[in-house]
Amino acid sequence: MKSLEEYTEILVKSIIKKPDLLKVSTHDIDGTIKLDILVPQDVMGSVIGKNGRTIHAIRKLISLYAYKENLPKVEVNVESF
């Protein structure tokens, strides 16, 4: 099975124009997985989506994946560079 980072990369790369610039990292802090998604500023709108619908869907899919893999709670953070 794919790791959480690989799964996230597949999801986000499919919706952005510059998939080669995507960076995904994870950190385990106090039993919670912090997932950081870094994308270029000009594709940030694609990741967030209208009224945050796209990022909400991404977060939901990541949470479902974590549940299926018996991973702890995942907090998703999206930033631009």
Predicted regions and their residues:
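ATP phosphate-binding glycine-rich loop and adjacent ATP-lid/helix-beta elements
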Residues: R53
